[in-house]
């Protein structure tokens, strides 16, 4: 894009095509977070996770299941807050795109912009599309 326009951009905003229920405010919030924190290379849109690895997530180990993270929490509300990256909005600084040799986004210094979880449905199947239509009628 820079070659085509002859302009240098500070950042890129990537809006995932399979998350059409995000709002203009969601995009503005993510961009504002990037403007507030110039030390962050990427802003990911996230929503509050419905599961928590310190409380109610497990992994299979051999012939049984174990906690993902060992803890003594007896309620999800006691555990540290965790978020799901919802892949709806990414605000990525130019320097990260141009200078970063590591393709793994999580290896950067990143921040988050929290969105309402009902606005996020990854449309990967016809069922997802029908669910999105039903939710869209109520937003």
Predicted segments — roles?
Residues 1-6:
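Glycine/small-residue-rich loop that forms an oxyanion/phosphate-binding "nest" at active or ligand-binding sites
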Residues 8-11, 20-109, 113-114:
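Conserved core of the sugar-phosphate nucleotidyltransferase
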Residues 101-121, 126-130, 134-139:
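Catalytic donor-sugar/metal-binding loop of nucleotide-sugar-dependent glycosyltransferases
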């Amino acid at each position: 894009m820079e070659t085509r326009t002859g302009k240098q951009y500070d950042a890129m905003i990537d809006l995932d095509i399979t998350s059409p229920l995000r709002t203009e405010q969601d995009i503005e919030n993510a961009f504002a977070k990037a403007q507030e924190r110039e030390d962050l290379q990427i802003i990911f849109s996230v929503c509050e996770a419905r599961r928590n690895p310190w409380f109610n997530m497990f992994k299979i180990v051999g012939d049984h299941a174990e906690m993902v993270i060992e803890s003594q929490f007896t309620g999800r509300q006691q555990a540290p807050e965790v978020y799901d990256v919802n892949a709806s909005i990414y605000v990525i600084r130019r320097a990260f795109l141009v200078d970063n040799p590591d393709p793994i986004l999580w290896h950067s210094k990143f921040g988050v912009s929290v969105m309402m979880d009902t606005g996020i449905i990854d449309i990967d199947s016809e069922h997802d599309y029908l669910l999105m239509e039903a939710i869209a009628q109520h937003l």
